[in-house]
A protein has these predicted regions:
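Short cysteine-rich clusters marking metal-coordination/redox-active sites
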Residues: 229-232, 261-264
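Low-acidity, Ser/Thr- and Arg-rich intrinsically disordered low-complexity segments
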Residues: 2-10, 28, 255
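Ubiquitin-like/PB1-type beta-grasp interaction modules and other compact soluble beta-rich domains
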Residues: 37-139
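Short linker/helix segments within small regulatory modules
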Residues: 246-257
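Short functional micro-motifs and their immediate structural scaffolds
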Residues: 234-238, 269
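Long, charged N-terminal interaction/targeting segments
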Residues: 89, 100-103, 109-224
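Residues immediately within or flanking Cys/His clusters that coordinate Zn2+
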Residues: 226, 258
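Short Cys/His-rich "knuckle" micro-motifs
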Residues: 239-242, 272-274
Length: 294
């Protein structure tokens, strides 16, 4: 027997073994595909469509199109919406087969569900079933992901708690107890049932975040710049130069206008930092579109 013949005689059984394995795998794949088709026929199905900026939460291939979800057991429309990665706090209107529903609506076989974000220029208060009751005044809670934004919002005069050391459970509890709006970059935090008001901040740059939030909540007319302590959020009080003189650097003692935080005793005056922050607020206001003419 030649060397080639000897090799061939040993190789052929091995080759036939691989062929058998390949055939078995192909059969297994066909079986799995057929089984999946059979299950899809037996299971219920509903179609979902997300509009406008809600597509930010979807993968590129799922944006702007109908998405079919198969299910064997029903669930609330809130659960289905969040299974796509969209927090319920981002949703302002849900239509099931063309009719407004709330988040507890049980999704059924054949349902066509349309999910909309906040409407900027259209009043849908008489239609929506998912929007929480309006707040008398907007108060915010920010987590560790948006710390610089917390300082900017306080600088603009808004009541802002900054939970940089708080757990997710603590943050959700504060939102529910104090009726605050949660601002975060963590979409899954917004999916907690206790969080009924919140917003997922898209931008990662703090100044753009400030502009984004001012636009989203229409805050331009509510700004009260330099009225809150940047450290502890307390409202500032006017202070005479004499009352704070000992706390001032020598080059600041010729200033006339001072504010004092009654809580942490920090003193504020109109220096270079004040001018930079004023410039930032002017930039924000200049980049907020004017309201539509009625």
């Amino acid at each position: 027997m030649t060397r080639t013949q000897s090799y061939t005689s040993r190789a052929n059984p091995k080759g036939s073994g691989y062929a058998a394995l390949g055939g078995a795998l192909a059969t297994s794949r066909r079986y799995a595909a057929n089984e999946m088709r059979r299950l899809c026929i037996l299971m219920s199905a509903a179609r979902f469509r997300f509009y406008a900026e809600l597509n930010d939460f979807l993968p590129d291939e799922s944006r702007g199109k109908d998405l079919t979800r198969y299910f064997s057991a029903g669930g609330s429309v809130k659960d289905f919406v969040e299974s796509f990665g969209v927090p319920h706090t981002e949703v302002d209107l849900v239509l099931a087969n063309g009719k407004p529903v709330d988040f507890s609506y049980p999704v059924r076989n054949g349902d066509r569900v349309s999910v909309y974000p906040v409407f900027e220029s259209l009043d849908i208060s008489s239609v929506t079933r998912v929007r929480p009751a309006p707040l008398r005044a907007l108060r915010f809670l920010l987590d560790v992901h948006v710390g610089r934004l917390a300082a900017y919002l306080r600088m603009a005069g808004f009541d802002v708690l900054y939970g940089n050391q708080a757990s997710d459970d603590d943050l959700a509890s504060i939102v529910a107890r104090e009726r605050r709006v949660l601002l975060t970059r963590d979409r899954y935090l917004l999916m907690r049932n206790a969080v009924d008001r919140g917003y997922w901040v898209r931008s990662t740059e703090p100044k753009q975040q400030l502009l984004e939030v001012v636009k989203r909540f229409d805050l331009t007319g509510s700004m009260r710049p330099f009225t809150r302590c940047l450290d502890c959020n307390t409202l500032l009080e006017k202070a005479s130069r004499e009352s704070v003189l000992e706390r001032l650097p020598p080059k600041i003692r010729d200033k006339d206008v001072f504010r004092l935080c009654p809580s942490c005793q920090r003193v504020y005056w109109e220096g270079s930092h004040h001018e930079r922050m004023s410039k930032l607020l002017r930039w924000v206001k200049a980049n907020v579109p004017a309201p539509p003419v009625a």
